[in-house]
Amino acid sequence: MRECISVHVGQAGVQIGNACWELFCLEHGIQADGTFGAQASKIHDDDSFTTFFSETGNGKHVPRAVMVDLEPTVVDEVRAGTYRHLFHPEQLITGKEDAANNYARGHYTVGKESIDLVLDRIRKLTDACSGLQGFLIFHSFGGGTGSGFTSLLMERLSLDYGKKSKLEFAIYPAPQVSTAVVEPYNSILTTHTTLEHSDCAFMVDNEAIYDICRRNLDIERPTYTNLNRLISQIVSSITASLRFDGALNVDLTEFQTNLVPYPRIHFPLVTYAPIISAEKAYHEQLSVAEITSSCFEPNSQMVKCDPRHGKYMACCMLYRGDVVPKDVNVAIAAIKTKRTIQFVDWCPTGFKVGINYQPPTVVPGGDLAKVQRAVCMLSNTTAIAEAWARLDHKFDLMYAKRAFVHWYVGEGMEEGEFSEAREDLAALEKDYEEVGTDSFEEENEGEEF
């Protein structure tokens, strides 16, 4: 089997984990205690779901997941929540003191005490796998645990499991909805440290999700539960091909092969459609062409940036539900003719398609309408560099005055690490810029000298 192990780090990671596993259980007909429900026999013609769940001797299904936080409160909610019997108690790991929004605490002082225990639990999970495919790591950029501990964990996973893929689902700090003043510091430090260890990172910008909840789902004041349920739909779409049989299936390494042209340029933009409330869905025909087209609208994106200003390097369309290849080909052809999508000139074709016949499931009492088909688009576009530019600018404003730096240095970090990380991100922005310049322009430049 091709197993995937999910690691949920810090408050954001764990809470998104809750939403994701709730949805996965619904999709696979697994009840809150890990046993199969009445409908399950219908669903289980295929056993692809064992990529995410392991089965115990007495027929219970346990997620292949670890939840880690350096302070106990968030994981305690899991321990006392609806799904408390789903997880093995050893899969829920907590420390005693939190990282206090401080990357240095998560990476050096406090994180160091928990890392071996976490790796030991991950080792137990990997030992139970026959063909481990890789790791999915859920975390935020802004928190201390999410940034610091994740980067420490990624370094150690690279050591222990060198060739296995590591995909991140990272919560990008939202410009409007900030939870900590030092988010830009943490984000840039963690990006710098994990850049060489991560194979592919799907960024989700809280503000973009807020806007989608307000605009498409008519939720005036979205809560984290609303956001996380939406994020879990996206994670579900990206991982559906790993958990169900389909016509055109995509596995973890295939994502990388098709989306990452250069090792550092591994931040695809995620777009999902249709995001629609039950009242509206009742009156709309959401055809393949329509949902495909809405993927190219900036307001279905998970990160605020404008792809019309950038160029596409690769594009991966993951359909699920009632979709046939012919419709997809027609829809994509229409987009190529109608839309002004600019691909970089060294990558002319650029569309990869996956189709999965399992229609999207929704959480009962949730915000999303039950629809027959959905699509998740992963595109590698140079426009996402806008997101880095925003963060870098905020970092510069604070770092020019060396604001808050003493908290990091006090935890054993060197000040030089800040400037090193900032230089690395400047290089990343430059990389994106260079990838977007046309190859024939460069050739002409060379002749002038």
Curated annotation (Swiss-Prot):
It is found in: Cytoplasm, Cytoskeleton. Mg(2+) binds at residue 71. A motif (MREC motif) lies at residues 1-4. Tubulin is the major constituent of microtubules, a cylinder consisting of laterally associated linear protofilaments composed of alpha- and beta-tubulin heterodimers. Microtubules grow by the addition of GTP-tubulin dimers to the microtubule end, where a stabilizing cap forms. Below the cap, tubulin dimers are in GDP-bound state, owing to GTPase activity of alpha-tubulin. Keywords: Cytoplasm, Cytoskeleton, GTP-binding, Hydrolase, Magnesium, Metal-binding, Microtubule, Nucleotide-binding. The lineage of its organism: Eukaryota, Metazoa, Chordata, Craniata, Vertebrata. This is Tubulin alpha-8 chain. The gene is TUBA8. One of its GO terms (cellular component) is cytoplasm. InterPro entries: Alpha_tubulin, Tub_FtsZ_C, Tubulin, Tubulin/FtsZ-like_C, Tubulin/FtsZ_2-layer-sand-dom, Tubulin/FtsZ_GTPase_sf, Tubulin_C, Tubulin_CS. It comes from Bos taurus (Bovine). The MREC motif may be critical for tubulin autoregulation. GTP binds at residues 11, 71, 140, 144-145, 179, 206, 228. PROSITE patterns: TUBULIN. Gene3D superfamilies: Helix hairpin bin, Tubulin/FtsZ, C-terminal domain, Tubulin/FtsZ, GTPase domain. It catalyses: GTP + H2O = GDP + phosphate + H(+). Its EC number is 3.6.5.-. Dimer of alpha and beta chains. A typical microtubule is a hollow water-filled tube with an outer diameter of 25 nm and an inner diameter of 15 nM. Alpha-beta heterodimers associate head-to-tail to form protofilaments running lengthwise along the microtubule wall with the beta-tubulin subunit facing the microtubule plus end conferring a structural polarity. Microtubules usually have 13 protofilaments but different protofilament numbers can be found in some organisms and specialized cells. Disulfide bonds: none annotated.
